[in-house]
Amino acid sequence: MAPQTETRAGAGFKAGVKDYRLTYYTPDYIVKDTDILAAFRMTPQPGVPPEECGAAVAAESSTGTWTTVWTDGLTSLDRYKGRCYDIEPVPGEENQYIAYVAYPLDLFEEGSVTNLFTSIVGNVFGFKALRALRLEDLRIPAAYAKTFQGPPHGIQVERDKLNKYGRGLLGCTIKPKLGLSAKNYGRAVYECLRGGLDFTKDDENVNSQPFMRWRDRFLFVAEAIYKAQSETGEIKGHYLNATAGTCEEMLKRAVCAKELGVPIIMHDYLTGGFTANTSLSNYCRDHGLLLHIHRAMHAVIDRQRNHGIHFRVLAKALRMSGGDHLHSGTVVGKLEGEREVTLGFVDLMRDDYIEKDRSRGIYFTQDWVSLPGVMPVASGGIHVWHMPALVEIFGDDACLQFGGGTLGHPWGNAPGAAANRVALEACTQARNEGRDLAREGGDVIRAACKWSPELAAACEVWKEIKFEFETIDKL
């Protein structure tokens, strides 16, 4: 006869489906300095109270599950659980709320963006009670920020390495992005650097394809860098994309770049992953390489207003994982980026202490406790007429990257680079003299055209080019 089993009511624990509000919605909770804080934009399913949704987000991204389990009694849930401590409606939106969740520090592995994201933006985003969920911001406490090494070098060390001060840096993505042979690619790099740019760049999808294997590209680009340096007397660089299918292959490419003596390499941090990115950042720090970060795939994650992760969170994550440059949008070019929102996360990349400012989308005061800053990269559909706005918006600590705005010059690559260099220096000088670039920028560019035929030709080509589309990511 088979043994009989019996579950007795009241013995051990009370089984059943949980009402999350009873455990995880705690409006009286006093936030600790060591808590990781998250602001979620929630859209509940019809009929689901926002308090239940906020509590469910806190539960499913920390210690909770859908039912009571007997092993809850083996630990202290009050110590480890996430808590939804505040909920506020989103102005002007129907059935949308900002839920504030506090997570105790012990839930997360030290120095691991991968673990942080696995918890906070993991399975909870598929929760049925929610129609949509977006992580708008994170507050990284000083105690957790200090477990990360951050960027390999940071803005000031980069300037010292390059011996370039008092102006923004200039870059150019080599086009066409795919199809050039390694030798022709190196030729384009040389022409741009000789013309006056500080950097040129591999496009994000240039890895090691049949038309141009990575080692060939590295060798021809290194030759171009050294030739341009010898002719101009300036330190030059090219973002050699080390992104690869495995971490081992990625690091092999980084080692080759180091042996060639080039100053900077590149990684696609979202497609490559945070574990790979942190490993590459550590290598760059140990071996004196700067690390340029491209954000390919970001719009899949951050462009929808109601669901996903805002780019300011991805930018914070990159600062912790490690990178000296990060693409940040332009405000004025062809790619998405509203001015106040963009300036908000640019400050989160560069500054050491950033005050809460909801007008710029910053939900929490952030203290990076001396973690090195990341230089923003403005790239995408920009040309010489945009230079006054770019200098006014980004200031000096930014890399302004003109791809088509260099290579599309009617006289060739080197004149295109010269036009951008003249425009940058003219705008920087005008700003330093106290002129208002927002109002007088066009006059500054036109005046510079009188002594730079390269700039005059560029201004004529791009005088009618505009990208007039409504931005999606608004406050």
UniProtKB/Swiss-Prot annotation:
The modification N6,N6,N6-trimethyllysine is found at residue 14. The record marks 334 as: Transition state stabilizer. Substrate binds at residues 123, 173, 177, 295, 327, 379. The active site is at 175 (proton acceptor), 294 (proton acceptor). Mg(2+) binds at residues 201, 203-204. The disulfide bond which can form in the large chain dimeric partners within the hexadecamer appears to be associated with oxidative stress and protein turnover. It holds the Pfam family RuBisCO_large_N. The modification N6-carboxylysine is found at residue 201. Its EC number is 4.1.1.39. The keyword Ribosomal protein does not apply. Keywords: Acetylation, Calvin cycle, Carbon dioxide fixation, Chloroplast, Disulfide bond, Lyase, Magnesium, Metal-binding, Methylation, Monooxygenase, Oxidoreductase, Photorespiration, Photosynthesis, Plastid. GO terms for biological process: photorespiration; reductive pentose-phosphate cycle. InterPro entries: RuBisCO, RuBisCo_large_chain_AS, RuBisCO_lsu_C, RuBisCO_lsu_C_sf, RuBisCO_lsu_fd_N, RuBisCO_lsu_N_sf, RuBisCO_lsuI. Its cofactor is Mg(2+). It is an enzyme of class 4 (lyase). One of its GO terms (molecular function) is ribulose-bisphosphate carboxylase activity. The modification N-acetylproline is found at residue 3. Heterohexadecamer of 8 large chains and 8 small chains; disulfide-linked. The disulfide link is formed within the large subunit homodimers. The basic functional RuBisCO is composed of a large chain homodimer in a 'head-to-tail' conformation. In form I RuBisCO this homodimer is arranged in a barrel-like tetramer with the small subunits forming a tetrameric 'cap' on each end of the 'barrel'. NCBIfam families: PRK04208.1. RuBisCO catalyzes two reactions: the carboxylation of D-ribulose 1,5-bisphosphate, the primary event in carbon dioxide fixation, as well as the oxidative fragmentation of the pentose substrate in the photorespiration process. Both reactions occur simultaneously and in competition at the same active site. HAMAP family: RuBisCO_L_type1. This is Ribulose bisphosphate carboxylase large chain. It comes from Oedogonium cardiacum. The lineage of its organism: Eukaryota, Viridiplantae, Chlorophyta, core chlorophytes, Chlorophyceae.
